[in-house]
């Protein structure tokens, strides 16, 4: 891979597994030093770090409970001491499926805190430095549910619509920062549909109807994703890396679906 991000530092939240880890690996392959953040045992975190360094760059884990603004602030300070944050990817996310009337209030609070408020706090600290240096990329991993709604996902949908709106505001505020030569500062959302990760396994099982796992996958896709294909985490990683290119300097404020036609219906 073209190591065009050599000398850049990236922070990817929620990057010890799944989509976030694939993004961290892709950025490392492109030459960026990558700060990872996320949950897991010491062994899992060590394995994630090794996979990122094996992809071609230096990596370090920075811990923080993303429900707590003070811990987020301390994490950003530690990452900035390690290297200026040139690329910020907010990927951490949780969900809880239940009818609106049955959603536990604590689930609402946690989902909004991790999926939306944490991104606000990281962006608020990282964007001014990006603007000063003339280059910066914020990529918020939203969801197709930041563009359309589904039943039984009120907190998740609210958080993802919120992060799309937050990203548009930040994109407008920083649109004139930097130049084409420096790369500019952009803020965008990637909005995946179904992606092959452990997060969707309960929904696959719920669609099996006594059949195989493959039957469950097909039923899940037939319901909403016309391509009948799952995205893979590395597909999302490739999109994030492309958004970091200088040629993407004028692509900002976008919410880009990677959903196999879900939102085209």
Regions found by a protein language model. Name each.
Residues 9, 16-17:
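Conserved glycine-rich cofactor-binding loop
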Residues 73, 93-109, 128, 132, ...:
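Conserved mid-core segment of classical short-chain dehydrogenase/reductases
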Residues 120-123, 127, 131, 135, ...:
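C-terminal substrate-recognition "lid" of short-chain dehydrogenase/reductases
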Residues 175, 179-181, 186, 251-253:
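Short, small/polar-rich loop/turn modules that mediate ligand/substrate recognition or access, typified
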């Amino acid at each position: 891979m073209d190591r065009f991000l050599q000398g850049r530092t990236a922070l990817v939240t929620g990057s010890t597994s799944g989509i976030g880890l694939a993004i961290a690996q892709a950025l490392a392959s492109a030459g960026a030093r990558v700060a990872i953040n996320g949950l897991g045992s010491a062994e899992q975190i060590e394995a994630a770090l090794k996979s990122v360094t094996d992809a071609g760059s230096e990596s370090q884990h920075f811990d923080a409970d993303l429900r707590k603004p003070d811990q987020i602030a301390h994490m950003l300070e530690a990452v900035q001491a390690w290297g200026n944050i040139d690329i910020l990817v907010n990927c951490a996310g949780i969900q809880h499926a239940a009818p609106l009337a049955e959603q536990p209030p604590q689930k609402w609070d946690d989902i909004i805190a991790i999926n939306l408020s944490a991104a606000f706090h990281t962006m608020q600290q990282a964007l001014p430095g990006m603007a000063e240096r003339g280059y910066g990329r914020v990529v918020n991993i939203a969801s197709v549910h930041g563009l359309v709604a589904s039943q039984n996902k009120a907190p998740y949908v609210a958080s993802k619509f919120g992060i799309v709106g937050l990203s548009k505001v930040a994109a407008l505020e920083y649109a004139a920062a930097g130049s084409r030569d420096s790369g500019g500062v952009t803020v965008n959302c990637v909005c995946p549909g179904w992606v092959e990760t452990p997060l969707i396994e309960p929904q696959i099982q719920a669609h099996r109807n006594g059949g195989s796992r493959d039957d469950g996958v097909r039923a899940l896709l037939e319901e909403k994703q016309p391509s009948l294909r799952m995205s893979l985490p590395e597909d999302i990683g490739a999109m994030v890396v492309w958004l970091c290119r200088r040629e993407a300097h004028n692509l900002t404020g976008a919410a880009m679906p990677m959903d196999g036609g879900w939102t085209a219906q």
